Amino acid sequence: MKIAVIYFGGQYNHLIVKDLKYLGLNAVLITPEKPVEILKDYDCIIFGGGPYSVITELNKMGNAVDYVLRTSQPKLGICLGHQLLAKVLGGEVTKATKPEYGLVKVNINDEDTILRGLSPSINAWESHTDEVISPPQGFRILANSENAKVQAMVNKDNTIFGVQFHPEVKHTEKGIEVFKNFIEACKK
């Protein structure tokens, strides 16, 4: 299986690739300046984190909007990637009332495909000042934290997932399970 990891300059993106390679997968970092057509050869797409805000800096994120709208592969958004999917697909993203940094208790409300094996809660690594406050139409909320209502979301077809936390950071409990679950979803 070949997975594109969209690299927005986030400090943890290389850890996503490392985790996927550990699972025996072919994972490649791709910068968003590449044309959308390059993604046709990949089985799934992961949108990593980064320093941008989808509220004010979508124009600095290359072809990210096209990557979301013009591809049909299963997608996972992590942190900024989660916010990108929400914003581009019609959800609402705002500045966080209380930004989250470090370990945060994430409550699993719906142990759907992406969060299988993680309930009732995990301690997860967070690093964000923006947050999804309303998922796109047809999505449901899978997890929340004390300060963020939408810690994880999924569309009705179980093909587009978003997590606000960083499963790739070793401090996140059972983070590798998120990737295993996403790979299973990609196979369907």
Swiss-Prot record:
Pfam family for this entry, one:
GATase
Q: Which GO terms describe its cellular component?
A: cytosol
Leading EC class? ligase
Where does the record place the catalytic residues? C79 (nucleophile), H166, E168
What the entry lists under CDD domains is as follows: GATase1_GMP_Synthase
Going by the UniProt record, its keywords in alphabetical order are: ATP-binding, Glutamine amidotransferase, GMP biosynthesis, Ligase, Nucleotide-binding, Purine biosynthesis
GO MF terms held by the record:
ATP binding; GMP synthase activity
Q: What InterPro entries does the database record attribute to this sequence?
A: Class_I_gatase-like, GATASE, GMP_synth_GATase, GMP_synthase_A
Q: Which PANTHER family match?
A: GMP SYNTHASE [GLUTAMINE-HYDROLYZING] (PTHR11922:SF2), GMP SYNTHASE-RELATED (PTHR11922)
> What is this protein's function?
Catalyzes the synthesis of GMP from XMP.
Q: How does it assemble?
A: Heterodimer composed of a glutamine amidotransferase subunit (A) and a GMP-binding subunit (B).
Protein name, UniProt field: GMP synthase [glutamine-hydrolyzing] subunit A
Native organism: Sulfurisphaera tokodaii (strain DSM 16993 / JCM 10545 / NBRC 100140 / 7)
